[in-house]
Amino acid sequence: MILDATCCPQNIRYPTDSSLLNESRELLEGMIDTAHQAGATGAQKPRTYRNLARRDWLRFVRDRKPNRKKVRKALRQQLGYVKRDLGYLESILAANPDALSAKQLEYLAVIRKLYEQQREMYENNTHRVDDRIVSLHQPWVRPIVRGKTAVAVEFGAKVAL
């Protein structure tokens, strides 16, 4: 009997570190808005620098082939924006634990793990980390290197046939 490992492909867009961090930042900004509308942030909404962050990310994405220096700069910027927003949400949740819905708390846990992974890869100057998150909406999906000519990396659950 011959066994072969294959993958159940998931339909997700190809994940880049910068796009995952940008998506995380946008979700965090939405959570901060939700908490502020519920009155959990006090009188003044925390600064999210959303316009600057979006401008920085779009400036990076427009580049057809960014060099290594530009990629690291974009990752550093997005990591900073995500870290700031996570800090705001930590203080909001410390004061008012019911400020976010259960679904938002799940996203927050995934974003925390993603931030730690991305920060570790940035600081160690690597592109590999165990149990890497490649989708915020489907955090169980993992990259599987297949070595096929058409697609080198597939995303999904690994199965043995």
Residue ranges and their predicted role:
Residues M1-A160:
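Polybasic low-complexity intrinsically disordered regions
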